[in-house]
Each structure stands twice: as structure tokens, then as C-alpha cells.
Amino acid sequence: MAVPKKRTSRSKKKIRKNVRKGKKHIGPAIKAFSLAKSISTGHSKSFYCIVNDDSSGSSESKLTAFDLDDP
């Protein structure tokens, strides 16, 4: 009878278990929810949006930090 040489690691067991249980597609949803939560609370330091400045007449775009407290 064939015997495995090394013990299977916990992380590999967990990955295989999650694939069997159908939990492999939850990761992107959790990341999206986490990003939305950090933006809504104002704690996001890595989310930027492009703002077009039409008041000056030029078509330049600025990269500014997204802030929900600014009206």
C-alpha cells in the first residue's frame, strides 16, 4: 500500500476543504466589502479618484484622495 512521505500541511488541508465546500469564490467579495467599508468610514489611504477641473477651462485631470467629509 502506498504511504505518503510527508504530512500534508494545515494550509493545504484548509484550501482543499474550502474547494470541496464551495468557498473558493468568497475572497473577492470580502475584499470589495472591506474596501467599501474603509472608504465609507474615511480610513482609506489608498483609494484615489480622478477629478476633472472644468472651471479653469483646461482639460487637465488631477489625482486626488477621495474624502467623504468634503461637501
Curated annotation (Swiss-Prot):
GO terms for cellular component: chloroplast; large ribosomal subunit. Transmembrane segments: none annotated. InterPro entries: Ribosomal_bL32 (IPR002677), Ribosomal_bL32_plant/cyanobact (IPR044958). GO terms for biological process: translation. Its main location: plastid. One of its GO terms (molecular function) is structural constituent of ribosome. Disulfide bonds: none annotated. Residues 1-24 are annotated as: Disordered. Keywords: Chloroplast, Plastid, Ribonucleoprotein, Ribosomal protein. It is found in: Plastid, Chloroplast. Belongs to the bacterial ribosomal protein bL32 family. PANTHER family: 50S RIBOSOMAL PROTEIN L32, CHLOROPLASTIC, LARGE RIBOSOMAL SUBUNIT PROTEIN BL32C. This is Large ribosomal subunit protein bL32c. It comes from Pinus koraiensis (Korean pine).
